A protein has these predicted regions:
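Domain-scale activation on soluble regions of proteins
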Residues: 1-163
Length: 163
């Protein structure tokens, strides 16, 4: 997304900062939930319970993936790729714990979330968020690939046993 904008004209895009951050954060959350629904060994009602009790908690969702998805498909949680994805999830989660900083200007007590004027590098932050989404999508794709292979092996075995 970031590459599509004119590098010289980022000053006019300051109004895009919060929507960009919100959309990427929401994408990260939905990708994690997708992994849980599609690749977890839990029953659908158990997955729904996990997702409902951890609605916007990116770190908790990633922990459930580490415990309930990665071991099934023999994905190593100590792999640098997965460790970095988890570290990036922690960074994003610690900045926006309940998915409201980018959605609303104030909290429930009518206090502004951003009291200080901070300057963020639009391109760097966008690249960071996009990389995180791509990393989680990569984990999902690898788990799906391995899930398909296991299903194919099971079908071959069942076919072999029937003959």
């Amino acid at each position: 997304m970031i590459e599509e904008f004119d590098q010289e004209n980022f000053s006019g895009l300051s109004h895009m900062f919060y929507p960009m951050c919100y959309l990427y954060r929401n994408d990260v959350e939905l990708l994690l939930k997708t992994i849980l629904f599609k690749c977890s060994s839990l029953r659908i009602d158990e997955v729904c319970k996990v997702v409902h009790s951890n609605k916007h908690k990116i770190v908790k969702l990633f922990e459930y993936i580490e415990q309930g998805v990665l071991p099934i498909y023999e994905l190593d949680a100590q792999d640098d790729f997965i460790k970095n994805a988890k570290r990036y999830c922690n960074i994003l989660h610690n900045f926006d714990l309940d998915s409201s900083k980018f959605r609303y200007p104030i909290n429930k007590l009518c206090e502004p979330y951003m009291r200080l004027i901070r300057y963020y590098d639009f391109v760097e932050l966008g690249t960071f968020l996009e990389s995180l989404c791509n990393a989680i999508d990569g984990i999902h794709n690898e788990a799906e690939y391995r899930k398909d292979i296991l299903a194919e092996i099971a079908a071959e075995y069942a076919n072999y046993m029937n003959d």
